Curated annotation (Swiss-Prot):
Biological process terms in GO annotation: division septum assembly; FtsZ-dependent cytokinesis
Protein's cellular compartments: Cytoplasm
Keywords from the named record: Cell cycle, Cell division, Cytoplasm, Septation
Name this polypeptide is given: Cell division protein ZapD
Residue ranges crossing the lipid bilayer per the database entry: none
Organism: Pectobacterium carotovorum subsp. carotovorum (strain PC1)
HAMAP family: ZapD
Length: 250
């Protein structure tokens, strides 16, 4: 297959915990990409991501699931100890990192609590559900805050992001290990359809040539999955009888 610059990477979670983690990862990325808050547009993107992140964190015990996964990844690494030729120093380093992340996560306050208690975040969060509800006459506090010196705003935003560090660091490590647990292999779909067993996997990763102008519609769970390729142009698009793509089951 061509180089990565000419392909699109799609990811699909095969269980609810991975679905939640990918959503949290996406929201954390939005926060870090828009943390400068130089105008109202970037500010609303930032605060909307915070509001959605808090909503996700309130739906389940994210900390417990992450701690379980950190322990599971440690046990998986331990199994590699018996494999001849394995880099034991690398194994020990990763296990030590996982233990440190678990300790930090265990000692951290309730996920998102620092953000929930912030007055400005609370005010903006209340108005985000109203279409156009963050105008200057609705939120004069935010309007005034955005005209504060940049260094003052950066200091406050830095504190917000720092409060999420235990969550972000643990999640980044877990998702990195999950993603690297699968190897991309070439596959062929017939008339736009492909299915296979998932072997108790957590995540599907699919690479597809941009030139095909197709996207995958994926359904599945931890034991089996199905992929149907559909054209971006639903009226004039073409699905080749045999389509080559790359798939990693992680």
């Amino acid at each position: 297959m061509s180089d990565a610059s000419s392909t699109i990477l799609f990811e699909y979670p095969l269980n609810e915990k991975t679905r939640t983690w990918l959503r949290i990862e996406s929201l954390l990325q939005q926060l870090h990409q828009n943390h400068s808050l130089t105008d109202m547009g970037s500010a609303l993107t930032f605060f909307r991501a915070i509001a959605e992140l808090l909503d996700v964190l309130e739906r389940g015990d994210v900390r417990t699931e992450l701690l379980k996964e950190l322990e599971r990844q440690q046990q998986k690494l331990l199994q590699w100890s018996d494999v001849p030729g394995v880099d034991m120093e690398r194994i020990h380093t990763l296990r030590r990192q996982l233990k440190d992340l678990a300790s930090t996560l265990m000692a951290a306050p309730r996920m998102g609590q620092f953000l929930r208690e912030d007055r400005l975040i609370g005010m903006v969060r209340q108005r985000l559900g109203i279409p156009g509800g963050c105008c200057s006459f609705d939120l004069p506090t935010l309007h005034s805050w955005l005209h504060q010196p940049q260094e003052l705003r950066e200091k406050l935003v830095s504190g917000w992001l720092s409060s999420l560090s235990p969550l972000k660091q643990a999640l980044d490590m877990i998702l990195e290990l999950i993603r690297h647990s699968g190897i991309f292999r070439p596959q062929i779909s017939l008339n736009g359809f492909f299915q296979d067993n998932a072997s108790d996997a957590d995540l599907l990763r699919l690479r597809l040539e941009q030139a095909h102008q197709l996207y995958p519609q994926i359904s599945g769970h931890k034991t089996r999955y199905a992929i149907r390729f559909l054209p971006l142009d639903s009226e004039n698009g073409h699905i080749p009888p045999r389509l080559t793509f790359e798939l990693a089951c992680c």
